[in-house]
């Protein structure tokens, strides 16, 4: 059909142990709730710096929705050395895994798209891990740059899969993933690419973002996001 775009595969990770379209659908149909207490080790790197930090961390230690095993990554599967993986923003690791799963969900062998004009369009808005990498001056090395940059989220995926189409990251805050999908659809309709990997990723690895949202009154009182609901009262 002229002027049509087909969604052929999906990959996902969400709080509540959701790691596939099937588990996401089951979660929705059962009315699941992923809100949980803050993991005890979430802000471990910031503990004990000062009394002021400790007080601030108490404000940031609110219930919310948290991904499990953010540090887990099979680097060698993607041809990445364990050392290089240490310097990768977890958002890069997550996109590699989920994009691979999306291709498999579509029945497309990842190796079959190598050398193609497939594009990568990723929305994000959190760069706190990269900031920490760049501020750790004694440990900066060759892998730090690409591991810290948001553009690496898309570019590393293009590199690993050998994709030659457009590859970029955009930040429009909460709408970033939707804008990424919109731009991917435009590129497909314009004939700029024949296949697009599009979506979003958002891992908040620093209490600073949580405190910023708290100060702005943008956090839900009970740690639950309630999109499209009359009781919606903030980010969860």
Feature map (PLM): residue ranges:
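Fold-independent oxyanion-binding glycine-rich loops
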Residues: 10-11, 69-70, 123-125, 161, ...
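Active-site-proximal alpha-helical scaffold in enzymes
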Residues: 6, 14, 93-111, 153, ...
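A glycine-rich phosphate-binding loop feature that marks nucleotide/adenosyl-phosphate handling sites
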Residues: 41-49, 116-124, 173-175, 200-204
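Glycine-/small-residue-rich "gating" segment that lines the acyl/pantetheine channel
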Residues: 36-40, 144, 151-158, 179-186, ...
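Beta-sheet entry/capping signal
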Residues: 3-6, 64, 117-120, 166-167, ...
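ACP-dependent fatty acid/polyketide chain-elongation machinery
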Residues: 1-87, 92-96, 100-104, 215-217, ...
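Active-site-proximal gating segment of KS-fold condensing enzymes and close homologs
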Residues: 55-56, 62-63, 82-90, 113, ...
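Flexible, low-complexity linker/loop segments at domain and module junctions
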Residues: 1-8, 110-116, 138, 235
